[in-house]
Amino acid sequence: MKDSLQTIGVFVRPTHYQNPLFEKLEQAKEWVLKLLEDEGFESFMIDSLDGAKDARLIEKADAFLCLGGDGTILGALRMTHSYNKPCFGVRIGNLGFLSAVELNGLKDFLQDFKQDRIKLEEHLALEGRIGKTSFYAINEIVIAKKKALGVLDIKAYAGHTPFNTYKGDGLIIATPLGSTAYNLSAHGPIVHALSQSYILTPLCDFSLTQRPLVLGAEFCLNFCAHEDALVVIDGQATYDLKANQPLYIQKSPTTTKLLQKNSRDYFKVLKEKLLWGESPSKKR
């Protein structure tokens, strides 16, 4: 790793000046670029998250530093996914499930990076297709109602075999990495982030017998809604799904690549972020 990773692209999601993090991000950008230079890396800034505009820059980089929260990391991972480049997150924000380090730990991380003392985690990603339009999802693909009234009927197939019809507000198809995101809020299960599976979690289903379903990633899935619906990617991008138009979902041939500290332990992250084992007074 230390012989080939020399150019670091720095992702910063555009932030309005009224955002509470605006000033902190502006200061951090300059500090990070200076630190990368001091540590012997070439670097450049990407702050548009516009894949077409930044394609040549993405090809130039060996890895990407994502400055912000999990939303910034997700946007960067989707944008770089087809280029098969690793990313790592420097947390400036709230929860930071995906982040490798805090800002004050970046210098040590970069030094470990140069000495090949970090690890590469490869996670399952989703590849979706509607008609001729293809896309990737890192956390989840959601089929959601386009209008507030009524329920949305979604027929689900594994290959050509129908296995369920969901009737409710929609359906989450999550990756293991995304199982602690929207899926968890919808009472879906936590699945180890390095597992090879899909998690299907209904949203406010009309039937009280519907429960989340975990399927092996060897399945190719497709879904049809009885009326026009929205397909939401990682909570950041949307596509229209016409009535009875199939949405195809399968395991992406390219993995999501995250650089993390060697000491990172998934169960420790769950315990710290979700406050497992803490007393109710501490949680408040």
Swiss-Prot record:
PANTHER family: NAD KINASE
EC number assigned by the record: 2.7.1.23
Principal EC category: transferase
A Pfam family this chain is assigned to: NAD_kinase_C
InterPro entries, per database record: ATP-NAD_kinase_N (IPR017438), ATP-NAD_kinase_PpnK-typ_C (IPR017437), NAD/diacylglycerol_kinase_sf (IPR016064), NADK (IPR002504)
The name this protein goes by in its record: NAD kinase
HAMAP family: NAD_kinase (MF_00361)
Species per Swiss-Prot/TrEMBL record: Helicobacter pylori (strain ATCC 700392 / 26695)
Localization in the cell: Cytoplasm
GO biological process, one term: NADP biosynthetic process
Reported function: Involved in the regulation of the intracellular balance of NAD and NADP, and is a key enzyme in the biosynthesis of NADP. Catalyzes specifically the phosphorylation on 2'-hydroxyl of the adenosine moiety of NAD to yield NADP.
Protein family membership: Belongs to the NAD kinase family.
Main location: cytoplasm
SUPFAM superfamilies registered for this protein in UniProt: NAD kinase/diacylglycerol kinase-like
